[in-house]
Amino acid sequence: MATPLLELAASRGVCFPLRARRLTLTPFRGLDAPAVWSFCRREQVWSWTSGRPESENALRESYLGAGDRLTVRAGDVIVGVGKVAVQDAWSQGGPREEARDAQAEIGWTIDPRQAGQGYGTELARALLGFAFNDLGVRRVEAHAFADNAPSLRIMEKVGMRHEGTFKEESLHLTRGWVDGATYAMLASEFHSSLTQE
């Protein structure tokens, strides 16, 4: 079973906050819930994420329980939430040590009031750097509904590879069965892309 994010980060000597060019990332705390709820409760947000939170308290408990969310600030303003869910890779013949904590799923949600400023792309790059450089995973995936053009553009901008579009693989709350898209990147690809910049 994968190591919880904050425990893995601590074991690797990671100190928060994480800093990107304009953004600061910290582990989600209960005190962050009101600001995050203010945008996650909007249909224009939850219709593109993993679900509709029933209340601010439900969002708080879900995020704290998952332990994989990072609050994203520009200055003192909460502008979004990032996700880094570390996972064990599948390994033939059962669990093997080199498969432990070997991959991660990343995700992002940006407050629509902050859209159009490049925060999504900056956040995705920061999450990739955190996963590869700080946590030491070898593979990162990101998933989205196939018609979520803004997220797909972000994945492409940061150099993630489109690995597949899957017909009607996700049951949406209001739209029924919808297609999903998966993008991924290997640590070697990430480090190679840095040398080309």
Each model region followed by its residue ranges:
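Active-site rim helix/loop that mediates acceptor-substrate recognition in acyltransferases
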Residues: R52-A74
